[in-house]
Amino acid sequence: MLGFAGCNDDENKDNIPPTLREYEAPVFMYGKTREEVKASVPYAYSGASETSLYFEGKGIVKEYIYIFEDDKVYSCGSILSDLYVYYLHTYLSQLYIYLEYRPGQRMYVYESEDKSLSIGLYPLNDGLAAVEYLKN
């Protein structure tokens, strides 16, 4: 995302870069079981671990992850290239209330207007970043 070939003002309505229009947040299903998530999400199932379910990404998202605690969805997230962090920060700041940057974790933190949802944007290893959604 170092630049956008062919980008002009008409393509950049609402100050959202064209590539970020391809960002689709995961369907948040707090409290749902593994079976309910598998049956409900619009993504292709790609695997599981003891604590998570993995689904193929869409658009710029490489993978969607649903994390479970006590066999219920605790959080979910999208994994994408860390090249999108700057643009995602700007984009998420338009959608949610930007709260703070946590330098030790290199994490941007946001909250929904109704304060029901917390969102974290942070880098992972190997050139990847995560956007994680948690119920407050």
Where are these regions (language model features)?
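Short helix/turn-capping signatures at newly exposed starts of structured segments
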Residues: 7-94, 136
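Short, exposed beta-strand-loop hairpins at the edges of beta-sheets
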Residues: 108-128
